[in-house]
Design a protein with these regions (language model features):
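Short, flexible hinge/linker loops that cap or flank conserved catalytic cores
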Residues: 25-28, 49, 108-109, 158
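A conserved FAD-binding loop/helix module that cradles the flavin
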Residues: 170-184
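Short FAD-binding loop at a beta-strand-to-alpha-helix junction that anchors the flavin cofactor
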Residues: 157-174
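Glycine-rich Rossmann-fold phosphate-binding loop(s) that bind the pyrophosphate
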Residues: 37-38
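Phosphate-binding beta-alpha-beta segment of Rossmann-like dinucleotide-binding domains, i.e.
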Residues: 1-31, 43
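Conserved S-adenosyl-L-methionine
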Residues: 50-54, 136
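Rossmann-like adenosine-cofactor binding region
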Residues: 62-157
Length: 184
């Protein structure tokens, strides 16, 4: 919902009930592509189904039966999934095969309204290509919790891009998560 832009406008005193100047997208009945179907991918699918999203999963190591048990549809070809998804959520390890997996060619194959979320590992998305894609309106937006260089370099152009929401690799920063981790 472009929360970062709304927040910025309200702080500037631009409180408008009809803020139609800021583009927003919703989750309801949209298509999400989950790349990587481990513990986090399985947790995410439950939330997506709550919004009646069409869920596609790309994970060459997980069977179609397992994915269908969770309510998803397995796809065999990442490129096919990228072309149709409204949201792309990455949940894979960084390896030689996954480094820069999402580059300019993959970004250019996506919908202009697509949003990418990466909470797995930095380096899976080519950050320069992502920044260019956002600036050129190749895709709509991104949410990143991980970066190729952590902490993120001060000269990283993503820091100045208002089409991306950034957080500091902070999945475990909630009080509830810290509590669970202390007993597991």
């Amino acid at each position: 919902k472009s929360i970062n832009q709304y927040d910025s406008e309200v702080r500037k005193g631009n409180f408008k009930k009809n803020a139609s100047i800021i583009e927003t997208l919703e989750l309801f009945k949209k298509e999400v592509l989950i790349v990587g179907f481990g513990r986090i991918g399985k947790c995410l699918i439950k939330r997506c189904l709550g919004f009646e999203m069409k869920v596609k999963v790309y994970d060459p190591f997980v069977s179609n039966d397992v994915i269908s048990q969770f309510g998803g549809n397995k796809i065999e070809n990442l490129n096919d999934g990228l072309k149709s998804c409204d949201y792309l959520s990455l949940h894979i390890p960084l390896t030689e095969k996954t480094k820069n997996m999402i580059d300019s060619s993959k970004l250019n194959s996506m919908k202009k309204s697509a949003i990418i979320i990466n909470t797995s590992r930095g380096g899976i998305i080519n950050e320069i290509d992502l920044n260019n894609a956002l600036n050129e309106k190749v895709i709509f937006g991104a949410g990143l919790d991980v970066f190729e260089q952590e902490p993120i370099n001060n000269d990283n152009p993503l820091l100045k891009n208002n089409k991306v929401i950034l957080s500091p690799h902070s999945a475990t920063f909630t009080n509830e998560c810290k509590s669970r981790m202390s007993i597991e």
